[in-house]
Amino acid sequence: MSILDWLIVLLPVAFVMYMAVHSRSYVRSVADYLAAGRICGRYVISVADVANALSIIVLLTQVEMYYKTGFAMSFWNKMMGPLGLVLSLTGFCVYRFRETRAMSLGQWLEMRYSRSFRIFAAALRSVSEMFANMIMPALAARFFIYFLDLPHEFTLFGHTFPTFMVVVVITLSLATTIICLGGTLALVITDTIQGLFCYPMLVIFTVFVLCTFSWTKEIIPVMSDRVAGESFLNSFDVDKLRDFNVFALVVTIVVTIMHRASWIGAGNTSAAKTPHEQKMANILGSWRNGFMTIFYVLMAITLITLFNHRNFSEKSKAIRNYLSHHISLQMVKDDAQRAEFDAAIAAIPPVTHEIGVDEPLSQDKNMDTPYYDTAREQFFRINGVPELTQQLETLKATNPGDTAAIAAAEDELRKKTGLANKNTQEYSTLYRQQMLAASMRNLLPTGLTGLFCLLMILMMVSTDDSRMYSAALTITQDVILPFKKNGFTPKQHIWVIRLVTLGVAVWFFLGSSYMSQLDYLKLYADIMCSMWLGGCGPVMIFGLYGRFGTTLGAWLSLVSGMLLSLGGMLVSRNWADIVYPWLDKHGWLPALTNLLPKLSGPFEPYILWRMDPQKFPINSTEIYFITMMVSMILYFVGSGLTHLIWKPGPFNLDRMLHRGKYNDEGKPEEKFDWSPKAIWAKIIGITPEYTKGDRAIAYSVFIYSFVYGFGLSFIGVLLLNVFGVWQADWWKYYFFVVFILEPCIIGVISTVWFSVGGFIDLRQLFRDLRNRKNINDLDDGRVNNGVSVADAATVASEEASDDQK
């Protein structure tokens, strides 16, 4: 990068770090450090969430997905629009959790269930979260090595150091510094500033892509050049594109509802002035989320057009050579073998595919296929597979009676073949994940290169500090604090969190070093997250909205979900080499072969279970759904048994939510109005707390998301296709208007809107921090007899008053 690019990167990052240092002077209590004093406005939270939502791992995952599917699947994603809208407008889970005034998930779990359950659940969530997120610095480090063309190793004072680990240390140091300086307050302030930087940059890169590639002459021809069943444009011609059916949609809907609160309880979720402000921040998020999605789509379109259109054949060839060379530097240690590997890749000719003349591209045969095939041949050569194959054939021909030698040769061949296949898979994984880094390095001019690097750094820092802080907060508040009967002093409390944060940073460093090869990332993340997500849904939803749930039900739900998820994932991972042979050895295959089709029969073709020696018959989506249903059933069974045997009575929700006689904020109790107008307002989440401006925002979100986004652009187009009115050629206009033009207009407007609102709210936040007078040192997350220690005096007074009456 040029000096200008480095200035563009360093100055904003330095300003972000300065604001983190500045925030430290405003931390006067544990509540400030843990929940930003609970005085944040809606725009501060919403803009900060922009930075949290943008991450390198999400960018790479989304770009990889859209690179494989194009626009076509985006149309079907609109089916989820009404659900997300309703959840945002009603403040589902978020509003009630803020009403509890809990500083962490565990504090609420103890208020709702028990202390032992708090400790177990918090520990489980922390372990799951830390294992799943510790790979994020590794992904970021690898991205910057490819984007900045850094050497994989460098020598300093006669010692050789891996660049990868140095970048990881820098990444974690930035995140750890922000956390230790001001906790949630520092995160909110720095994330808001990063969000204010990010949104204009998204607009700039969107304009750049649309000006670099012609929509009608380059993008659409490439997107149209796909075989039947794998269309990148026609949303009704995607049956061979990926697994997509009614059952998958049902699971997505269930997951969206059941896990609405599964990761709640840290940072911004407890920082709003009131539950209403938290709810409005989520509603405002509906305006910003769409533009982030189009950024991911446009980055994928950039890669699709760049790598598949002959107008960019020379540039794409140079990028592919650069990308493969970096991968070979990482994977092939022998200089001579690496030179031969690079020469074989360089010998692949540039793109000569002529759209409309040559055979359309597919997932199995496309412009990347020659690179995967060549890499596979080279890895087989490097591992000596051809020589071992020849030696085995010679041994069988010359000495067929030497069974021991033949068996040993076969074992060695299998071992080397497996290693070559693993190397090929690792190459393809790195190739897909680093396509964006290599492409943007070679595509962007001076100035924009620095802006893109800045955007990636902000994505990295905002995500790493949030994930690390979430884990540190959960461990401190919900695993350590419950064992401290009298709590810590405020100063001790904050230092404990800082020390735990350092421990989490070390854990992330060690995890990144072991996960540096980036192999099986999705499977690994799924297994780790499922430890918590498998059974936490019923615990969260019915704990916030029901009086029936009990501690026994919560235990059964969480433990069963954890065991079923882990069991399903591990069986799936080891099916071909361990589980299937074991079933065959014990004679269970015939029975299972007959049983599985009978079990899936009522749900076919959406669920199809057939015995297969290579693949576990039940896929991950089905495992996830079964786990959620079993854990939900056990939650109610356990709760029912508790009420049947011990008869504890219904849980006191009013006390937990500070409602009714426990309302210490002077808010009038809302009485439901059964008039049509009131019912309609209730449906879209409007309450007496809404001002005229709030109502305008809520109605605008409803009209845009439901009436236009779902009604016209999805249901309307769906009906036109069903009745045969829609023409295949119309898709290019549809996607340009709905997925390009409209989000760009909204992006420009919302950039100005959120920037002004975020700046005003941020300034007000500093004013409120300076002018605070009532600071409660007991507000530190402790719970006593199901009541927050900070609320104990108020609750005792109200209950004593009731006893006198």
Task: Report residues per predicted region.
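Solvent-exposed, non-transmembrane helices and loops of integral membrane proteins
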Residues: 771-794
